[in-house]
Amino acid sequence: MKKNTDSEMDQRLGYKFLVPDPKAGVFYRPLHFQYVSYSNFILHRLHGILTVKRPLLSFKNNTERIMIEISNVKVTPPDYSPIIASIKGKSYDALATFTVNIFKEVMAKEGISITKISSYEGKDSHLIKIPLLIGYGNKNPLDTAKYLVPNVIGGVFINKQSVEKVGINLVEKITTWPKFRVVKPNSFTFSFSSVSPPNILPTRYRHYKISLDISQLEASNISSTKTFITVNIVLLSQYLSRVSLGFIRRSLSYDMPPEVVYLVNAIIDSAKRLTESITDFNIDTYINDLVEAEHVKQKSQLTINEFKYEMLHNFLPHMNYTPDQLKGFYMISLLRKFLYCIYYTSRYPDRDSMVCHRILTYGKYFETLAHDELENYIGNIRNDIMNNHKNRGTYAVNIHVLTTPGLNHAFSSLLSGKFKKSDGSYRTHPHYSWMQNISIPRSVGFYPDQVKISKMFSVRKYHPSQYLYFCSSDVPERGPQVGLVSQLSVLSSITNILTSEYLDLEKKICEYIRSYYKDDISYFETGFPITIENALVASLNPNMICDFVTDFRRRKRMGFFGNLEVGITLVRDHMNEIRINIGAGRLVRPFLVVDNGELMMDVCPELESRLDDMTFSDIQKEFPHVIEMVDIEQFTFSNVCESVQKFRMMSKDERKQYDLCDFPAEFRDGYVASSLVGINHNSGPRAILGCAQAKQAISCLSSDIRNKIDNGIHLMYPERPIVISKALETSKIAANCFGQHVTIALMSYKGINQEDGIIIKKQFIQRGGLDIVTAKKHQVEIPLENFNNKERDRSNAYSKLESNGLVRLNAFLESGDAMARNISSRTLEDDFARDNQISFDVSEKYTDMYKSRVERVQVELTDKVKVRVLTMKERRPILGDKFTTRTSQKGTVAYIADETELPYDENGITPDVIINSTSIFSRKTISMLIEVILTAAYSAKPYNNKGENRPVCFPSSNETSIDTYMQFAKQCYEHLNPKLTEKELSDKIFCEKILYDPETDKPYASKVFFGPIYYLRLRHLTQDKATVRCRGKKTKLIRQANEGRKRGGGIKFGEMERDCLIAHGAANTITEVLKDSEEDYQDVYICENCGDIAAQIKSINTCLRCSKLNLSPLLTKIDTTHVSKVFLTQMNARGVKVKLDFERRPPSFYKPLDKVDLKPSFLK
């Protein structure tokens, strides 16, 4: 639609990132990071986790040890790559086996003697079975343990076995920045976690807390429950770093505001007073005394030297092999941040900032579970050895303990949405839209309990750190997660790195840092600490920081370190730190590089001419300084210009202040938001509502729906959208389709299409317009004896079953039909009965309102009979079904009109859908009109000048003016018919047509907006929601219809329904519905003295209140509703007295009788 010019180079570069890049192994960009994460776990990480050699038990001062060794770990993946298998949708199933050896080591003078205790060589191919990434279910179609109808080649597929079901990427609870917290006025804490590097297994975790109370500065301590002593933070830093208190004072005070310097002096002085209060103070003796006290307190079995070594050696596991002196300098840098944060809290990354968090991808889920289950497995072996030694006096292990690692059960729980035992459940995949196959694996969310604790986590605010990396439009509009920003933007991805790559990268970076002059990287007193994954490695001369960071970034882009996703962050603002991040789980995305005030894209003249023939990896190799992969921490502490256009309008001095420049606005949306059109031309809420509706659109889910026993709704005749964005095309959402093109007219139709009502053409429905097929899984578990029982009295519910007790293939199920035989029987304890066996049907019935055809039946025979039935039903649009455009103009079918009832144009064409025209103005969806105009222009000229079919690019967010799109439409029509007059051309551009009244055949006075648009059918279907019924079950308490369609529920008749009938004056109807039916009628006796409801004691009605006072009141019988009685009883139980009083008045239908005077007449 638009020519590629120099001003659009940024857009073309952004598109290059989205398309596949086979040279770099990227075949599908949206989920590439998930594929790599999963592949790394199977091919590399699992082997390292399972390879273990460690002591289980030790005796006699560690001279005798029971050892466990897991070796010969063999992971058997298929012949093809996990990534290729994922894209092709093939079943990826990796199997792992290993050998366990348990032996006893005895240390003697002659040496170490080894005695074998037990051994298990895992030859079972299913010892550890890693589930599928993408692909469904049963590999063996002729499995004898399963009964299958029809038993065709291809088997039956159960979606539950796919990792695709897992759901969102969880944010790790451990933060990479310490968490600052105000406990109370003038009292603060600084909590941080230390996790060992990925090459150290099992992973060691330590959590520390620094406390500071202004009123008790001597108690400024660092502590960790059971893993470290409680000690003054300044003295600990001095002990580790071996420097004076003056050195620490100068280090903390350097480049700090005056108020922070004052607090630094106070803390150092308090530490000095603490040392002076102890006679002959020695820092080593002081720490040793604290360690000994902690040893006694914990009642440790270790010797004091072993205990001290264990505590101090494991202090700060992330700096495991680092000298104590660097650990001390690291503690000083932490204390520096802490003191600064007290005064300038808003400038420090808070706990909600994505800067502080790493993200768990699919491979990381499996890795975490493998760690946990391996520890459980080893723990079970240890306990079994101890129990056998205690009971039998021998070191032995039961074989069933060795053969059940427990990983398979943990992986199975993960696929059900359960991640770890302590973390609760989280949402898994629904199956309504193909778009959700992409959107959910790219969603980032907090743990469920973190979402609920709103006091701790303000996750419902659009945090500044989420800008550009997350989609601001695709957020829930209602429910418990309303406003939760979770969807990644199209350019964002999550880093993955192998352990070997991690160690090599760390080594290269350290070598580069140490290539600087020794004195320049040893400024530990007043320099900028350099950390790699929070581990301190050097401290840089403050005069060299800018040159160091600039040179590091240039070398990174040129591939000097062998990894283009390294993050380097220069933290200024008095915190003074250079942070280098290389680990997995970081959010990264590309940015355009600005170097010394120049946009590097502009200084590469060859780039534009060669760009069409290059992939993204080619650009990174041949033009390394044009684009840089930046993680979210580096972005937060960098100066980023929001657009190339804005950057070019700045002066040269202003440009030099920037480090990076962003891509156009369309790349800030997620893939769901990219399916919308022109959201920046509409009102803001339309984007949020549009994303929600797009995910509810019914699409073409799978080409193998007949073999996949799973719920799903599938569009029968999908069409590829004409108006699309590049992200929609590269993600294959457009190719998989999620709607159809229909002809709409914006007008009023006999007052029927008010509000959200739409008119739909009957012939359009009959031709298969927006027709769908519903696939539904019905699953029942039946006890084996019930399944084998025979029915004594023939039941209509079993009319669709075959002699084997299963529903017949191709049978049409109606409401009330059983899907499998389930007959329960009992024996009566009656010696005189001829037949003391009674049986009754307890089968689960088909409950849907519509008939469905049985497509497939599967049975698993174990201790219970598991029956799975797949039913299919074609469902055409009916009254009440929901539809929408891609601009959130939803509509509900209000009337299905015959073609003869609809207006027509000069060619006799009638609209498929009529939409209320006022909805455009009230919802401000201008882009809906633009979409119609562009789709109509495409129909006039569907090919470009080279004769190739081309869709129209109308991105979700764009800076293109509406006039540009109008000019494009004008050129299309002029190309088709150059002789059009200005008026005719204007009508065609703006899709205005004269329509004729079908009743009078006369033209309407005004022109009507009439044209094609991409229309979506939503999964909100009338027959799935309708619960209205005249008769049926009611609840015992309130005598209203029970809830739930599966239980035959109905709609409750509540206050609003009552008010409607009152407004219509239908008093008798209210009486009939709420009172006169036999279920609701209730006789109640009321005490006329106190107004209480009488109680029934031994069939005698008595007023309890009056009987205690020895009164004999009059009880009056009234008829009321059962609900009224329940209401009064519940109010009384809550201490609220409701008195029923009787009104004293004469009958309303008779006048008072005339008085009769009985006096004798002579007395009158």
Swiss-Prot record:
One of the record's GO molecular function terms: metal ion binding
Task: Name one cellular component (GO) term.
Answer: DNA-directed RNA polymerase complex
Q: Source organism's superkingdom?
A: Viruses
**EC number from the UniProt entry:** 2.7.7.6
Principal subcellular localisation of the protein: virion
Q: Which Pfam families match?
A: RNA_pol_Rpb2_3 (PF04565), RNA_pol_Rpb2_5 (PF04567), RNA_pol_Rpb2_6 (PF00562), RNA_pol_Rpb2_7 (PF04560), rpo132 (PF12415)
**Cell location:** Virion
Q: Which SUPFAM superfamilies match?
A: beta and beta-prime subunits of DNA dependent RNA-polymerase
One GO BP annotation is:
DNA-templated transcription
Q: Which UniProt keywords apply?
A: DNA-directed RNA polymerase, Metal-binding, Nucleotidyltransferase, Phosphoprotein, Transcription, Transferase, Virion
InterPro entries according to UniProt: DNA-dir_RNA_pol_su2 (IPR015712), DNA-dir_RNAP_su2_dom (IPR007120), DNA-dir_RNAP_su2_hyb_sf (IPR037033), RNA_pol_132_poxvirus (IPR024390), RNA_pol_bsu_CS (IPR007121), RNA_pol_Rpb2_3 (IPR007645), RNA_pol_Rpb2_5 (IPR007647), RNA_pol_Rpb2_7 (IPR007641)
Q: Which reaction does it catalyse?
A: RNA(n) + a ribonucleoside 5'-triphosphate = RNA(n+1) + diphosphate
What is the protein's quaternary organization?
The DNA-dependent RNA polymerase used for intermediate and late genes expression consists of eight subunits 147 kDa, 133 kDa, 35 kDa, 30 kDa, 22 kDa, 19 kDa, 18 kDa and 7 kDa totalling more than 500 kDa in mass. The same holoenzyme, with the addition of the transcription-specificity factor RAP94, is used for early gene expression.
Q: What does this protein do?
A: Part of the DNA-dependent RNA polymerase which catalyzes the transcription of viral DNA into RNA using the four ribonucleoside triphosphates as substrates. Responsible for the transcription of early, intermediate and late genes. DNA-dependent RNA polymerase associates with the early transcription factor (ETF), itself composed of OPG118 and OPG133, thereby allowing the early genes transcription. Late transcription, and probably also intermediate transcription, require newly synthesized RNA polymerase.
Protein family membership: Belongs to the RNA polymerase beta chain family.
Its name, as the record gives it, is DNA-directed RNA polymerase 133 kDa polypeptide
Lineage, uppermost ranks: Viruses, Varidnaviria, Bamfordvirae, Nucleocytoviricota, Pokkesviricetes
- In the UniProt record, the gene name given for this protein reads OPG151
